[in-house]
Regions:
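C-terminal motif of bacterial Sec signal peptides marking the signal peptidase cleavage site
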Residues: 18-21
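Bacterial signal peptide processing site
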Residues: 23-25
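Low-complexity, acidic Ser/Thr/Pro/Gly-rich terminal tails and inter-domain linkers that flank the onset
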Residues: 29-68, 208
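Surface-exposed edge beta-strand/loop patches
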Residues: 35, 126-192
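Short, solvent-exposed beta-strand/turn "edge" segments of beta-rich domains on protein surfaces
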Residues: 58-75, 81-85, 131-133, 219-220
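The feature marks short-to-medium sequence segments in extracytoplasmic or secretory-pathway proteins
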Residues: 81-132
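Short, hydrophobic/aromatic beta-strand segments
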Residues: 84-92, 153-154, 239-244
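A cross-kingdom signal targeting lumenal/periplasmic-facing segments of multi-pass membrane
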Residues: 255-429
Length: 431
């Protein structure tokens, strides 16, 4: 085991030095001016604005490196033209938010009494202060736990007998996510003639069943993981739901992210934004990838998504692949000479995602359609790195909507007839 560990570490370093020679040594950062990134929502006389600060911006505003202690300020402004006072609920933004006094104390331990008092006064002055009386505009910062790339900002304003909820998906500068590189949300991937907008459910179902079964390698000469996921929605519903339930963007592969991968692989530490390898559909690698990491780099749920030329009642249709990493190993089938090992039960990762999304309140409908076809446990298929997997062979289809939907009101479409409908127990005997 010791010899294998030494070999593995040596191989990782060789792969890293080989690979980083071909990668960008730095990545472009977005303009770091949080006031230029303000997002605003309005509802019945109440206007709410928000912006999430980068590491450098928080240093400039507070004068201390908040990010080093895992703290991230969110700037909030509430203009109340209603007839009643509101209270901003900080736990709605982050259940583990940092009160200003606690955060100031973390940076004042080595300061003298005068400097400590100045720091405490500054943190208190910058903090958002409740309540928000009628006819007033209140602004300030709430100190949250650090996120890179993107942050889901949910703001709950309460009053006697009233609740107003505002949600933002806010980009955080200083982090190069893969979807930034492709500009998947801003660029027109398909011509007007290529886009097909489905309004008939049966036609849409047939189109989903006729999608390719697998991702492939770059040359499309070998099949990989099953395409087992379809998401209908966009920046107003599907992606806020994914982020809110813990999925995070993956970093592009560059020298810095490769080195983080190396150190995390050796130490076993968590890397919430670790890059994923490229897989191919529609002649291109994934448009974006998201992952939900555990406490170490070897274990994570990750999904890759491609924007298709289909629309459903005008909404974007994303085709994807989801699986769960349960370890890592050496391989000759990856340019890095190491790869994550997937859980062979790929349906479990899909089921976990659908269950997560049910709690998002943005999931409106859910269905199964025919996909890759069944691969039983005793006759599994293999992905591109030769990991075996087994599956019932269906695709999970999730329809999102900006309007809240409780779990009890989610519609289960009977597109694919399974015993008990879509809520079918995945027992080992059935495999």
């Amino acid at each position: 085991m010791k010899i294998f560990r030494i070999l593995r570490i040596t191989t990782i370093f060789i792969a890293a030095f080989t690979f980083t020679a071909c990668t960008t040594t730095s990545h472009q950062q977005e303009t770091e001016d949080y006031l230029s990134r303000i997002q605003t929502h309005k509802e019945n006389g109440v206007s709410v604005s928000a912006s999430v600060l980068s590491d450098n911006e928080s240093l400039q505003v507070y004068g201390v490196p908040l990010a080093r202690k895992g703290i991230q300020p969110v700037w909030i402004e509430v203009e109340n033209n209603d007839d009643i006072a509101y209270w901003l609920m900080s736990p709605g933004l982050d259940p583990n938010f940092f009160p200003a006094s606690e955060a100031a104390e973390a940076f004042s331990l080595l300061s003298g009494n005068v400097e400590k008092r100045k720091l405490e006064e500054k943190f208190a002055r910058l903090a958002f202060k409740n309540p928000i009386p009628p006819g007033t505009k209140i602004s300030g910062f709430v100190l949250t736990n650090l996120d890179h790339g993107v942050k889901m900002v949910q703001l709950d304003l309460v009053a006697s007998g009233r609740l107003k909820t505002f949600s933002f998906m806010s980009v955080v500068p200083g982090f190069q996510a893969d979807y930034h590189t492709k500009d998947v949300f801003g660029k027109q991937l398909y011509s007007t003639d290529e886009i097909i907008n489905f309004i008939d459910d049966n036609e849409f179902r047939m189109a989903l069943e006729n999608l390719p079964c697998f991702v492939t390698n770059k040359n499309a000469t070998r099949n990989g993981d099953p395409l087992n996921l379809v998401i209908i929605g966009g920046l107003d519903d599907a992606f806020p739901a994914l982020v809110m339930l813990g999925l995070r963007p993956t970093e592009v592969t560059w020298s810095g992210s490769v080195m983080k991968m190396i150190t995390s692989t050796i130490s076993g530490e968590r890397y919430r934004y670790a890059p994923v390898s490229p897989l191919y559909l529609f002649g291109r690698s994934q448009d974006l990838a998201l992952q939900k990491a555990r406490d170490n780099i070897h274990q994570r749920n990750h999904l890759r998504l491609w924007k298709s030329s289909m629309r459903y009642h005008g909404q974007p249709v994303w085709v994807g692949q989801i699986s769960r990493d349960i370890g890592s190993r050496l391989t000759i089938h990856s340019p890095y000479l190491t790869t994550h090992k997937i859980d062979p039960d790929v349906d479990e990762a899909l089921n976990a995602l659908m269950e997560d999304m049910a709690y998002s309140q943005n999931l409106k409908k859910i269905a199964l359609v025919k996909g890759v076809g069944a691969a039983p446990r005793n006759a599994p298929r293999q992905n591109l790195t030769t990991d075996p997997y087994y599956t019932q062979g269906h695709r999970g289809v999730m329809f999102f909507d900006p309007r809240p939907t409780s779990i009890a009101d989610i519609e289960f479409l009977d597109w694919e007839g399974l015993p008990g409908g879509i809520i079918k127990a995945s027992t080992k005997e059935q495999r």
